[in-house]
Amino acid sequence: MKNTKLIVKTKSKTYPIYFGNNILNKTGWLIKKNLPNVKKICIISDNKLPKLLLKKLIKSLKKYELKIYKLSASERTKSFKVANKIIEQLLNDNFNKSDCVIAMGGGVLGDLSAFISNLTKRGLKFINIPTTLLAQADASIGGKTGINSSQGKNLIGTYYQPDFILSDVSILKSLPQREIISGYGEILKHSIILDRKFFLWLFKNGKKIINEKNNIFLKKAIIKSCKIKCKVVNKDEKEKNLRMILNFGHTFAHGFEGAKNFSKKLNHGEAVLLGMMIASELSNKKKKLSLKDLLLIKKHYLNLKLPMFITKTFKKNEVKKIIYFMKKDKKNIDEKINLILLNKIGKTTLPKEFSLKSDEIRNFLNSYFL
């Protein structure tokens, strides 16, 4: 499989994303090429990754002074306590602004590592090596850093772009089916909001991605997904306007995750898939999305057995908790819950165009349990 490079151009930084098969062992060479002044490297790695992956990375970095942390990739890890502990140790080890933090894991460790990089001495170098489909296709791009609060997900954070991203597609072969489905949710989101042609390609080839983990189709879907997100981020790095459309399905998703206490009962990608289905049905109810397009989306969900029924995951008495976390969402305006809805496959409503009172959303969610 041919290696590919995509350039991200934001106002604050221009940086490359490297895609390929078995390219993890090129990390050291890429650091030398892109960041020649690095001497010390802190690796923050998912403790459940195959040991061989970390060994490969360490072997490629043998010329550098290494500090290694293996962390649990749970939402509870994204905390001030964990971030502060690592920052204090980096300061104790005299990490300088020219030194580097590498995240090796999914979106959770990417968010946390970028947060740590940004706050330590007002900015260390940062490299992201995403090891999940969700992170390769979405979470690693865009510069959002974050930790969680008891009030909700990612309510504390900054924007801090990486110096480069390395996406080794061959790593995804080891992922369980649930993780592939989770990542597919973000790929599908990018097609639904901005690219009908890509959606129709996924409609035709989704099973090759999810069931077969076909390397060629996986790479094509990841790169296309990244190109769509990059196009948006390049225009609106700090989510002042256009970038908000990337939150399609996410306001519901954050409510769903919160209602399950951000536990592994419902992971982020599953919550996004469920949130997109609810947002699509609400779009149809509000006469934004045609029944024809809604049925096409539903057919794709059914074909791939994607999470789509709120009643299979929640009970009616959990709706109140869902609304509580939706009201905490960063995108809300005044007392209303701001939503991105669909006009058609490939086009959303405008950011800040559509907001509803929490009572109306509560009634809409309750209607599923009648």
Regions found by a protein language model. Name each.
Residues 204-317:
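Active-site segments that bind and position negatively charged phosphate/pyrophosphate groups
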Residues 14, 288-370:
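C-terminal charged capping/lid subdomain of soluble metabolic enzymes
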Residues 108-115, 136, 255:
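Short glycine/serine/threonine-rich phosphate/pyrophosphate-binding segments
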Residues 73-74, 104-106, 248-249:
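Glycine-rich beta-strand-to-loop/alpha-helix junction loops that act as flexible
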Residues 93, 160-162, 184, 292-295, ...:
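Nucleotide-activated sugar donor-binding and catalytic core shared by glycosyltransferases
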Residues 1-100:
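ATP/NTP phosphate-donor binding region
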Residues 9, 18, 115-207:
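A glycine/threonine-rich phosphate-anchoring loop and its flanking beta-alpha core
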